[in-house]
């Protein structure tokens, strides 16, 4: 076979092809290093003897549709200059890998647009071979995110499996990179992050998180000088949960069958942003439901008013709006609203801190959506470390892996 084909297509530069044969549908190239190119693997001397050889097989990039192997005759070298007795270097493969570097690069190229399952089928190798190549690449490029430049971070959780199995992630809000992945969603989930952060803790200026008491306690303990910010996303999300809880309670209490039907069919309209309901029929349906039930109407309009806390021109005006909202919720005597008011009052300082730093968890919620897609792409994950590395590389748009 032409030497340039071996060099350019297969990534083999020092060896010559001695023979070509087929094993079923598979193509096998028999290669070896010419005598004049053999040298000591330690000192590079050509003052050597060959003390035997053996055949080592490598998976190479396919030629056409044929799975291709390289059977290389690897010589044992005895050097007269340095005295070593070792096998010759195989520069087209890494260490004891059974595939060539060119094959690994092809796997990584395919990983930009194909799943592990697709790649393993196309290249006729096992799922684990593809996963291990990806993992080696991820470990060398993403295993130790730089924490020294962190200034503003966000903390959140996501479910790894159905049920209550969670992981905690920390995101650099200035570049959108995941910099830490912790097991579970409690206070201890961040222990590894604090340990890795070390003296760089003093550089953290602000932390955005949800209404989790575990996270707020952990941040207050380890980052006493950082501002803690609770953004509108999680407050609004909690308010929507309270509104839906009230809707279900009212549905169970309502005796009139027709009114029950009206309440049951309005969940989507109640939870949606009122300014986004443009359909005239939907608007009439919502107003009809609210007119039939005063507690539901109060809760709905308080939900709509809640976002005004983040629409003020100053922190002082936002404080006044927040205090007035809490007052109205308490005076309503509606239990879910009173609980919501209690929560907002408890997190008042953190909510208003948004006006000092203007950070939200919007970035991290977008990342959570990417994580859902990632889990589908890899058909679940069989290796915790591999999954974490995939998360660390999630921001790199040039990679599908």
Predicted regions and their residues:
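Short, flexible, glycine/charge-rich loop motifs used to bind or transfer phosphoryl groups or to couple energy/partner
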Residues: 30, 142-144, 194-198
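Active-site beta-loop-alpha junctions of metal-dependent nucleic acid enzymes
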Residues: 96-99, 178-200
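The DNA-recognition helices of helix-turn-helix-type DNA-binding domains
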Residues: 47, 126, 137-141, 211, ...
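Acidic/histidine-rich catalytic cores and adjacent linkers
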Residues: 33, 37, 42, 162-164, ...
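Short, positively charged, Gly/Tyr-enriched micro-motifs
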Residues: 57-164, 201-204, 217, 351-352
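Short, surface-exposed amphipathic charged segments that create phosphate/polyanion-binding patches used
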Residues: 240-251
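Short, conserved DNA-binding cores of transcription-related domains
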Residues: 1-84, 89-90
């Amino acid at each position: 076979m032409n030497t340039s084909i071996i060099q350019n297509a297969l990534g083999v530069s020092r060896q010559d092809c001695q023979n070509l044969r087929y094993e079923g549908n598979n193509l096998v190239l028999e290669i070896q290093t010419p005598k004049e190119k053999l040298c000591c693997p330690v000192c590079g001397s050509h003052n050597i003897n060959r003390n035997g050889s053996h055949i080592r097989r490598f998976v190479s990039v396919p030629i056409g549709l044929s799975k291709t192997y390289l059977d290389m005759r690897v010589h044992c070298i005895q050097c007269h200059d340095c005295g070593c007795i070792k096998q010759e270097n195989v520069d087209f493969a890494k260490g004891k890998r059974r595939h060539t570097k060119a094959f690994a690069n092809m796997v990584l190229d395919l990983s930009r647009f194909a799943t592990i399952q697709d790649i393993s089928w196309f290249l006729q190798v096992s799922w684990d071979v593809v996963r291990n190549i990806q993992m080696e690449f991820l470990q060398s490029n993403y295993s130790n995110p730089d924490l020294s430049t962190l200034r503003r971070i966000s903390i959140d959780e996501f479910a790894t499996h159905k049920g209550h199995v969670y992981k905690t992630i920390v995101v650099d809000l200035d570049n959108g990179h995941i910099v830490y992945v912790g097991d579970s969603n409690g206070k201890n989930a961040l222990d590894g992050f604090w340990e890795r952060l070390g003296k760089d803790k003093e550089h953290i200026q602000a932390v955005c998180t949800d209404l989790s008491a575990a996270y707020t306690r952990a941040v207050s303990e380890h980052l006493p000088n950082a501002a803690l910010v609770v953004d509108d996303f999680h407050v609004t999300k909690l308010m929507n949960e309270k509104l839906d809880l009230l809707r279900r309670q009212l549905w169970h209490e309502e005796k009139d069958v027709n009114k029950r039907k009206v309440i049951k069919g309005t969940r989507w309209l109640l939870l949606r942003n009122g300014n986004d309901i443009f359909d005239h029929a939907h608007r009439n349906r919502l107003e009809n439901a609210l007119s039939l039930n005063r507690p539901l109407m109060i809760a709905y309009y308080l939900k709509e008013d809640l976002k005004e806390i983040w629409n003020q021109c100053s922190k002082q005006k936002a404080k006044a709006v927040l205090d007035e909202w809490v007052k109205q919720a308490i005076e309503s005597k509606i239990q879910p609203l009173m609980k919501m008011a209690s929560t907002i009052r408890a997190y008042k300082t953190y909510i208003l801190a948004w006006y000092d730093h203007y950070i939200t968890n919007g970035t991290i919620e977008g990342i959570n959506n990417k994580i859902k897609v990632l889990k589908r792409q890899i058909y679940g994950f069989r290796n915790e470390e591999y999954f974490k590395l995939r998360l660390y590389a999630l921001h790199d748009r040039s990679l599908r892996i």
